[in-house]
Every structure is written in structure tokens, then in C-alpha cells.
């Protein structure tokens, strides 16, 4: 990454890798190709957005116990997988007011409360957490959702990789995770059913539904 002139954050853990990288498009593509050459990372997915300036000041690589801190020893998300819901399917469900089986769709925001305050889907549930590790403790508050269609979502889909399987393991029957998160939804569906902006963790601060930066750093 450094040799390619990229800046950003790379998080490494036993459960995988999560990277936010910025630089010339060709350099990012080259690094992505190199990562996918590792047999463990062949299915690595990337979400792209463009910025007028580099939104990171340096390259930071960190090894962590968890990519997203849940603090649930023994929990294995692979034991209770939750399907990914394509953005276009979610929009169709929201347009119709129900899923393909006629069931009400409940949107559950898995982000921190201050992120939700900046923007979220209309009518989404806000668990009111200040850090993701509190999410599990809120599940009992939503026992009435166990027999309803729940779609979890977060910025890029990473937190939902744990939140949705955790809900499945807790007895929520029909739980999805929004594929690619909010940013992928913006890319495919624009701002339909969305209110406000979406917080991102770089110098842009937040993105509008057209993926333009609230703070672009160009002036």
C-alpha cells in the first residue's frame, strides 16, 4: 500500500481484513488485485467512491482481536449465517411496503446513535447505542420482531456481518443484511427512502445519497 502511494486504514484480525484506502484508481485496483491473489481473500469485495482530494492523511495498519468489536466470546457468525439482501430488492420492498411474501419489512440500523442522527432510512429503528459492542444487549428490546422480516444495515456492511447472524442465533427467524451497506445502496438506488447523509470515517465526514462529500477538501 505504501509503495503504491495509498493512504487510509487497514484492519487485520483472525476473522478477516477491512481496509479503507485512497489514492490513484489504478493503484487501488493493483493493491486489490494483490490482496485477492491470497487464496483466503479471493472473494474480497470492494466498494468504490471518488473524492476530489485524499480523504486520509496517512497509512495506518493495525492488528486487532476483532475487525468489529462485539465482545461475545465463542460467538461464530458462520454458525448462524444471515442472507445478504441486494439494494434493489430492498428498494422494491420499501416501495411496495412489504417483502415478497407480503410481510412488513422492519429496518434496523446497527450504527451508533450519533451516526443515525446524521441520516438513516425513513422509519428505521435506532437501537441507541454508543458503540457496537452494546448491540447484543439491545436484542431483548426487540423480541416482537422475531417473527417479522428484519433488514439490518450499516455504512458498508461490516457491522451487519455480525449483527444479523447474532440476531439469527438469538431466534429472529427472518433476518437479512443489506448487501454492501448504505454506500452500496446509494450507488444502486440513490436516496430513495433515505433521510439525511451517511457518516464516513475519513476527512469527508459524510456522504450525500449521490455519493458526493459533505466536506470535499477541494477549497
Segments (PLM) and residue ranges:
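Secretory/periplasmic and organellar redox-cofactor proteins
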Residues: 1-3, 79, 88-97
Amino acid at each position: 500500500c505504501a509503495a503504491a502511494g495509498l493512504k487510509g486504514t487497514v484492519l487485520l484480525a483472525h476473522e478477516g481484513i477491512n481496509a479503507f484506502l485512497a489514492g490513484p484508481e489504478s493503484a487501488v485496483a493493483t493493491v486489490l488485485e494483490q490482496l485477492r491473489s491470497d487464496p483466503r481473500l479471493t472473494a474480497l469485495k470492494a466498494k468504490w467512491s471518488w473524492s476530489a482530494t485524499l480523504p486520509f492523511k496517512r497509512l495506518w495498519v493495525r492488528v486487532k482481536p476483532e475487525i468489529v468489536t462485539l465482545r461475545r466470546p465463542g460467538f461464530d457468525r458462520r454458525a448462524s449465517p444471515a442472507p445478504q439482501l441486494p439494494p434493489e430488492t430492498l428498494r422494491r420492498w420499501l416501495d411496495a411496503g412489504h417483502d415478497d411474501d407480503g410481510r412488513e419489512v422492519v429496518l434496523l440500523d446497527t450504527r451508533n446513535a450519533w451516526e443515525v442522527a446524521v441520516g438513516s432510512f425513513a422509519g428505521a429503528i435506532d437501537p441507541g447505542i454508543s458503540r457496537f459492542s452494546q448491540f447484543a444487549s439491545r436484542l431483548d428490546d426487540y423480541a416482537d420482531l422475531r417473527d417479522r422480516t428484519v433488514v439490518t444495515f450499516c455504512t458498508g456492511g461490516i457491522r451487519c456481518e455480525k449483527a444479523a447472524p447474532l440476531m439469527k442465533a438469538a431466534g429472529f427467524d427472518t433476518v437479512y443484511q443489506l448487501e454492501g451497506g448504505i454506500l452500496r445502496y446509494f450507488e444502486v438506488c440513490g436516496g430513495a427512502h433515505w433521510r439525511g447523509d451517511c457518516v464516513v470515517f475519513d476527512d469527508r465526514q459524510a456522504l450525500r445519497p449521490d455519493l458526493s462529500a459533505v466536506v470535499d477538501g477541494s477549497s
